[in-house]
Amino acid sequence: MDPSRETFDGSTRDSYKPPNGAEMMGQSELNTQNRIPYNTSANNRNWQIPLYWQQRGNEFQASPPPPLGYVTPEYGATGTPVNANNASRVDYATTAANVPEEYANDYSSELAYIHNVNDMPHVDGLSNHSPATQPDLFETPAQSDPILFSSYPHAAQARVDPSISKDLYNMVPRPDANTVSPHAARSASSLPVPKEASETPFRDASTDLFDEHAHAAPMHSSISISTLLSDSDRYEPHVSLTENISPVMAPSIDARLSQTILRGLPPAQKLSPNSSQSQITHNRRKHKLPLNATTNNSVVLTPDTSPLLDSDEVVSDDDSNEQQTMMMKFNYLQHLRNKRDEAVHAEKRRLLDIRGSIHDRLVCRYENRYNKLHASEYNHHHDWAVRQAIREEVAAVEAAKIRADEEKKKKEREEQVRLLQESADKDAEMNEASTATSENEDLKDDLSLADLSSKKTANSQATENNNTPSKAKVKAESKVRSKAKSDKSRAKLSSDTNKDSEKNDNNDASLQSAGVASDGESSPETPLTKASKSKKAKASKLANDTSKNANGETKSTPKKSKKKTSKAQQEANSTTAEGKEKLSGDSTETGNSTNKEASTEDTKANATASAPNKKKKTVETLQQQVIKEIARKEIPRVYKIIQQNQYNRSTNARKTSQLCGREARRWQFRTIKNNKDMQTKAKRAMRETMVFWKRNERVERDLRKKAEREALDRAKKEEELRESRRQARKLDFLITQTELYSHFVGRKMDREQDLPSATNTASVSEINFDSDEEEDIRRLAVESAQEAVQKAREHSQLFDANRQQSPNNSSSDMNEGEMNFQNPTLVNAFEVKQPKMLMCKLKEYQLKGLNWLANLYEQGINGILADEMGLGKTVQSISVMAYLAETHNIWGPFLVIAPASTLHNWQQEITRFVPKLKCIPYWGSTKDRKILRKFWCRKNMTYDENSPFHVVVTSYQLVVLDAQYFQSVKWQYMILDEAQAIKSSSSSRWKSLLAFKCRNRLLLTGTPIQNTMQELWALLHFIMPSLFDSHNEFSEWFSKDIESHAQSNTQLNEQQLKRLHMILKPFMLRRVKKNVQSELGEKIEKEVYCDLTQRQKILYQALRRQISIAELLEKAILGGDDTVASIMNLVMQFRKVCNHPDLFEREDVRSPLSLATWSKSIYINREGNFLDVPYNTRNFITFSIPRLLYEQGGILSVPGLNTSRGFETKYLYNLMNIWNPEYTNDSIKSNPEGSPFSWLRFVDESPQTLFQTFQNPVVHYLDEAEASSSLKEEQLCRQEFCYGKDYSNVRKMLLLPKSITKVDVLGSDFKEDSPFYHLTHVLEESDSQLDLTLLDSVLVQRASAPPIDIYCPGSRQFTVLQSRFQRDHLWSHYLYQPLKGEEDLIINNQAVSKLPIPRKPLLPSFGIAKGSYSNVRIPSMLRFIADSGKLSKLDKLLVELKANDHRVLIYFQMTRMIDLMEEYLTFRQYKYLRLDGSSKISQRRDMVTEWQTRPELFVFLLSTRAGGLGINLTAADTVIFYDSDWNPSIDSQAMDRAHRIGQQKQVTVYRFITRGTIEERIVIRAKEKEEVQKVVISGGETRPTKQMDLKGNSREMVSWLLEE
């Protein structure tokens, strides 16, 4: 089997088959540098299909490559091939020069087709083998491919005519030219044609082989029609027509006829054979031709000398000859084109067939030879390497098994030695014990026989010495015997170890001998064999070291170890020396026998190694079977394992050596290390001791703190119990004191009888509420009340020292049974009539209020006038000032502080009601206020009727800014309008006003309690600081019970509530509208619930997902100012979503990106009265049409000398025209009754008039458009040709209105689409047409551009005609004229109305019609309304209110929402006004006046904080709260701007609430605050509501967010 046909997995490779064109695409070419085909490496076998021809798609412009398998190359101007892969172009000469000799004979057949192959004489069999070739059309080798010859383009260029070479190679022409023999042409035409080339057309839809401007298209060297017909190239037919035409396409040509046809001359101007030679010479000089140039048939061809005539003109009277000549011209040109195409296609097919055959033979043979050479070398090296690796692996496995057996035997021998040593030790101990016993017995015998005679002793001793051995001798012999036994066992063990080591050596030798190849030849030196040798050397060295260690050799033992032998061992050796000498013979014999056995085993091992391996073939057979399984996977893996093991062994050995060295040097550092260890241990012990004592102290401290905490808790509970009892008694004291105060004030007791001295009265702080008795506390309360009355009277006397007071002894009792503040406590004290200087009539309840205020002033007591909004608090306050001026001659100074929006109202009402009081409006800039202060800020100023001022009106902001100036004046009366502005006792405003010097203070507020009871205490302390001194205690007393009642509907103590009312009654007067004003109807409040729109839901859910519960709880616990601000910000974001999503982000105006250019601006002032501004917008993209395509009748075909438009004009519109006058006359004369033109006599028209009408281009155009709408299709084709295939698809996606132009509305019949129908049904059709023109597009394009400009380079005629067609004044009137102009022409000009009018648009409009669809996308206001649920409801509500003549006040919390509402009102065309915090004071006055006096104003937009205080807007009868305020009192004041005195209509209040959002919780919270007011002011019961925190702090808002 051929190894080159085997793959690595053992499967057979498929035989080579020449690939087709599709498989060859994208392959690499031959790489001659490495002498390896197709750019592959030596071990890479992925080259079974080596292909080097690459198909290039850039040879054809704007179209895919042709489907042929091989394509022709491109050639540049210098004749070299132009290709993207020139870097990898095959050098066949170099390739052939490097082919080995053994393949020269096989390769010589291919070298005939390689250029310069004869230049290699050094290669045998390769030189002089090029077969003879036949010349073809180009006199080149017929069987070769031009791409294989580097010099072929130059040679071909030299042999082609200059005019033809321009079309073929686009190179610089050369003057020399050779003719082509007919034999070469016939032989070339007889070559076979590839099947794929014959079946596939060479020319596709988008590529013209004869287009001069398609430079990338391949051209043939035959004559092209573009060359024959190009007048600018000055092609001379007599030079190249008959000489260079291929015989296949060269019929017999009449020189005169060809001259006539090619130059386009009429027959009347043909030259005769007898023409003069001078005329011919003149023509040759004119056209720069050689004088001796002749054709093959020796016929002289001369060009025409007369001017060229248009083919449409009639140049001769002989119409028949003219027609024949033109037909011959047309037919011959068609015949010439067909012949040329056939020759070109045949030549192309022949070249492609030659290229395919050459490629197949070269590639197939080269691959086969290379495969054989590569496969033999690869298999030789690869197989030997695999076998060697397997041998090494088997040897390694066997060595590992041998080493494992050795280790096992070694362990067994060590165990035997240990057992023998133990037995020997036991025997020695026993011998010593027996020897000691015998010695004792001998000693006893000596002592017993001491008294015997010496003779007997001597005899006995001599006998004993002769017959029995001595006991010492016996002892020595036993020791020697045991020692010899142990030595024998050691010798046996060492002999076994020697045998094992010899076996290892024999195994290594056998493994080494196994590395020899089976055929006896040594393997070549490869990296694999070198690695195996080094590995073997290391393994043998390791085995020798192991055997030496096992045998116990002492040669490798260091000398130092010998010196360290202990003295005990030396003594033992000396003791057993005698035993060793006696048993040396036995041990020597044993050693000799052991050596003999070892030598015998070595001999056997050597014999085994040297003997021939009988199982060698069997092993090799097994190896061949295993090789295919483990060659790819096992060998690399095992090799990696071996490498890793070797690395691990070396690493372990290195670490072991390092550890040994460290241990050897340890004794040198023993002292230092011990010291360090001692210090470390001491530190650790000290640290642990400290930790223990700290832990102990911490536990003791915790226990102590726990005990202290428990004690504090017990004490705190006891203190709370005592404090609760103390507070209860203190509250009772305060109530009693206030009741007595009210009683004293009402009865007007005498000072001498009832009021004690101040020295006998104790202060509240000095009273001990824990130990004092009830009687003592009551007595102290009486004294405190009397003292308070005395202080109040003394304070008023400071201002009345110089005035005479008229005492009034009338008194009244308290009305303790009433639970309201409608009847003042000081009633019946004295009656006050309405002042005469007051220029209005007070109502009954207003007169009662004046009496109450006058009595408070007389007693020096401050009060709170808390009438409901709209009951005339301002008039009552002004009447008090008039009363003081008229009755007591107190003309001031009076100070009125009011919100900024009501300052003008105060000034106007004071001037109108009391003209005698001079009022100074104190507001404006810093400079203005400085000037105003000169009038009232004076020292020692007296106030009477002639004083420069009496009343100063200013705002809260200015009072705080200029507090130093106001504090320098002693004010008789200070009136605070909308006193809820000082509800916070911690504000700087409250503190500044409290420091003013004034006799009396009057607070005007419609809501004395807005949120909590703490605000009520702030007002009470402001008017009576001596009674209501403790803020915390007041809040603790009243907030706990009343607010909990409003929160959870608990039961109130009625008695305590009555006493609380008694506290407030002396200082507060409050009336409601329903009780005192019967003519003012009640207001109707409605809640309008709105749903979130889809856009609002998305934003609301997004905000909810961003909230972190953990952060909210943490912020609720902290409760700082920053925390409250951040939580408030979150709540406001939710409220923005409920109002309108555009509060986050407005929708911008969008328009597509304009990809166009414009001309520079025109100076209009220089153009005079008439300015012509043409359409000058241009696209960045321009499309070039080849001149030949334009002139040959392409997309924009126009009549010309060399186009077919002249034939169409002549034959189709003139000769073959049924409207010809001659044909019409003949038809009428031949058949007057049955002629199709018999109707002419009825319309009184002549055939000539009919022919002129037909020749009108407009009539032709309308006829075609009416019949088949071909014009519209042509326009679409042009658009698709310029923009691409997706243009029509994009237009289908758009919802575009139909253009309303003249074409659509004008017609000739009285149908629904005729102009007369539309003119008579204008009212019916106007609405529908308006909807169509205003229709928006569904799809918004990202970019827009004008149509792509088309131009033809080199043709001025195209540019002129194109601009004339688009800019012509007559045609532009019909193409782009608007509808209005056409209607005017129809109505005013009857002549124009008779003309035929086009029914459909001729061209798309360049601009945008008036009122039609625009690309500029302005946000839709309808969508703006639909995006908000509230705005949608408001839109419907305003329509109803407008229809019923209502006027509306709309309140907002956010000024940005007011901005959006202004856009909505402008869109709906509602007249409105706007007032917010940014409005100036003067503007507010003017807007209020304008609203009250202009009934056409429909809506008043106000902010709740700025426009809800103090102004009178009774002209409105409807109030709408777009979003509710946190404070219900603010909303109540805002709705009372319309529901007040002077309102004649029913007031309706609408409150918009978004369902299921945070707004619902805000409204519930506001209702609970209203319940607090209801309890405190009117004493009514409340309905049960959801339990919530009334403090209004961060925890309340956190609870709302958690519910979200």
Swiss-Prot record:
Domain of life: Eukaryota
EC class of the enzyme, as a word: hydrolase
Name assigned to this protein: Chromatin-remodeling ATPase INO80
UniProt feature, compositional bias: Polar residues: 28-38, 271-281, 457-470, 507-526, 543-553, 568-577, 585-597, 802-820
Entry remark concerning the domains of this protein: The DBINO region is involved in binding to DNA.
Annotated positions binding ATP: 867-874
Phosphothreonine found at: 179
Gene for this chain: ino80
Family: Belongs to the SNF2/RAD54 helicase family.
Compartments where found: Nucleus
